[in-house]
Amino acid sequence: MQLTILGSAASYPDAGRACAGHLVRSGGTSVLLDCGNGVLSNLGRVLDPTALSAVFISHSHVDHFADVYALEAALRYAPAGPLPPLPLYLPTGVFELMSGALTEHGASELAEAFEVHELTPGEVVRVGGLTVIACPVEHVGVTLAFVVEDGGARLCYTADTRLGDAVRDAARGASVLLADATLPQAFAGRAPHMTPVEA
């Protein structure tokens, strides 16, 4: 299993740095965990976006899904012609939120580009040789951490979360922990994020 961090900026992209987006590859399987602002450009440096096997979105904040709109265009206007719908896994209601920002025609095109699967906390999904487990964490509404398993390797991507039992449970046994550390230590406890010390 190979992890490529495509973006780790908080809320908005910094100069030269995209928002949340992480590529996990194993064999011929390529899974994108979150697809925030600027991620698609960075993805294109390491993988043709049309080669993705699936996309997983952690929650309803735009800095974690903004480039899904650009990905839809990449799939629709691929040189080989429109591609089959790409599996898109996300919490209940998030796709509706994403579609609501578009015109009726735009929402229709978005729905055609993706095979939408609304995840329930605890759900286990197989994508090629990878197993992805959706683990509830504490941020806003339904927010999911993703545990990706490949043979004996176990990666935990916490997504945005406060420190608590939920994220500890998700991270237990991880070979690699990719953790939210948005808040400076001086702001610990002021928002549903972890500090570097907590992470």
What are these regions (language model features)?
Residues M1-T50, T143-A159, V176:
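Conserved beta-strand hairpin/beta-sheet module of binuclear metal-dependent hydrolase folds
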Residues F56, I133, Y157:
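Conserved Rossmann-like nucleotide-binding pocket used by diverse enzymes
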Residues G38-P87, G173-S175:
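Active-site metal-binding motif and surrounding structural segment of the metallo-beta-lactamase
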Residues R162-A199:
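Cap/insert and terminal regions of metallo-dependent hydrolase folds
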